[in-house]
A protein has these predicted regions:
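Short beta-strand-centered interaction patches in the first periplasmic/extracellular domains
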Residues: 2-3, 102-111, 147-225, 231
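Acidic, small/polar-enriched beta strand-loop surface segments
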Residues: 3-8, 12, 20, 188, ...
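Acidic, low-complexity/disordered segments
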Residues: 5, 319-387, 392
Length: 416
């Protein structure tokens, strides 16, 4: 029997070390377990013990470098459903007047291997998917990379971590990166590919609803907040580049369509209504040919359109909720539809709320504090050497100056 068919009140989160559940004398001291996952970010797990002698992590095998697994289980199904598999990276002690001494264990999934150190590397004549496969193999992570048709003459990892490198490549073409547990093999797998289409969500019908289908008033839901917004959205997105072999600019354009949020409101219509003829033009990376430019414009459109709808739900424990899975929402007015989960948090507090799950369906931007900090950092744009065309050599002051046009930047812009 699937865990999803059982009452959520029967579910708890259990901690395993090397495939064996930790002893009751240790598990009974668990104060909180929290597993947080998000596309384009490593998954993390935090386990908090009430620990008067501050020895539990060592005694139960949760030492730095050891592997830990968290599963949602019931009394009848001790194997349960895995929601986290990773490696312990941090041990911490805390003290509270009310709670006494606490030991805290923090672990991260296999993607943490891609965050150690920075490197400069070149990958000649490869697609981004092929690069992801090479990186995964180099770090001994099983990788599933959805093929992408554009082959680049050279893909450069420019003094950055492998993880930041893969996320940058994925964002450019509308892909996502995350490590998930393969439900068939139980092994952590690095996924590099498009987001799961919202249309794959199960329909919200039937006597026994799917664990991925919900409706307003559902007794599984504790809190729900949903919104739709056209703020900052344009009807189309474009990317520009320069084809060095042809000596011509390349331009890609894609409509703002979303396959991660499907409801009665269309982001393209919102962009046309609020933004008029304006377009969002991507200039942070100069694409090298027409195919790369087209892929970049499609990736930008996917990122913009994904953020127009925002769904946040807190519910009773549900191990089926994971990033890059599709859910359906019924009886929600104009927000009735299907959505792709971008982040989830599974929390188990045995003496307080029990097992709870929360999810967010929104855009692909990093909403963590680190992501907000990075977004606030300003940097100089368009610095370096770029292609230009001389358009006017008649300097009125005879100082040998010329005017330059940058057709990859704009059809009309000319240097002052």
């Amino acid at each position: 029997m699937s865990l999803a068919t059982l009452s959520t009140s029967d579910l708890i989160l259990r901690v395993f070390v090397d495939g064996i559940p930790i002893l009751p004398e240790f598990s009974n001291q668990i104060r909180r377990v929290e597993v947080e996952s998000q596309v384009n970010l490593p998954s993390s797990c935090e386990i908090e013990f009430t620990d008067p002698d501050l020895l539990i992590p060592v005694e139960c095998g949760l030492e730095i470098g050891n592997f830990v697994e968290v599963r949602a289980v019931t009394g009848d199904d001790a194997a349960g459903e895995a929601i986290f598999f990773g490696q312990v990276e941090t041990l911490e002690i805390q003290f509270e007047n009310a709670g006494g001494r606490l030991s805290v264990v923090r672990a991260y999934d296999a993607s943490h291997r891609l965050l150690h150190g920075q490197k400069t590397m070149g990958y000649p004549m490869m697609s981004y998917s092929e690069v992801a496969e090479v990186v995964g193999a180099e770090h001994a992570i099983i990788t599933e990379a959805v093929p992408h048709p554009v082959v680049h003459e050279m893909v450069v990892q420019a003094n950055e971590t492998y993880w930041d490198f893969l996320v940058r490549l994925a964002k450019e073409i509308g892909y996502v990166v995350n490590v998930a547990i393969n439900p068939l093999t139980g092994t952590p797998t690095l996924h590099f590919g498009p987001t799961m289409p919202a249309e794959t969500a199960p329909p919200p019908i039937g006597i026994d609803p799917s664990p991925l289908s919900f409706s307003i008033g559902d007794d599984r839901i504790i809190n729900l907040e949903a919104s739709v917004s056209g703020s900052g959205i344009t009807a189309a997105s474009s990317a520009r580049g320069w084809d060095q072999s042809l000596g011509l600019p390349s331009l890609g354009e894609a409509p703002t369509l979303s396959d991660t949020s499907l409801n009665t409101v269309l982001p393209e219509e919102l962009g046309a209504e609020l933004g008029g003829v304006n377009q969002f033009v991507r200039l942070d990376r100069l694409a090298g040919n027409e195919a790369a430019t087209e892929a970049a414009s499609e990736g930008l459109a996917a990122r913009l359109s994904g953020a127009y709808a925002n769904i946040e739900i807190e519910m009773r424990g549900n191990p089926s909720i994971m990033p890059n899975r599709a859910i359906s929402l019924a009886d929600a007015g104009l927000l009735t539809g299907e959505y792709t989960v971008t982040s989830s948090i599974h929390t188990f507090a045995p003496n307080l709320t029990g097992y709870r799950t929360s999810l967010v369906c929104s855009g692909l931007e990093d909403r963590t504090l680190a992501g907000l900090q990075d977004s606030a950092v300003t940097s100089s744009k368009l610095t370096g050497v770029y292609s230009a065309i001389v358009t006017d050599t008649e300097d009125p002051e005879a100082m040998g100056r010329v005017l330059l046009s940058f057709p990859w930047l704009s059809e009309t812009y000319v240097s002052p």
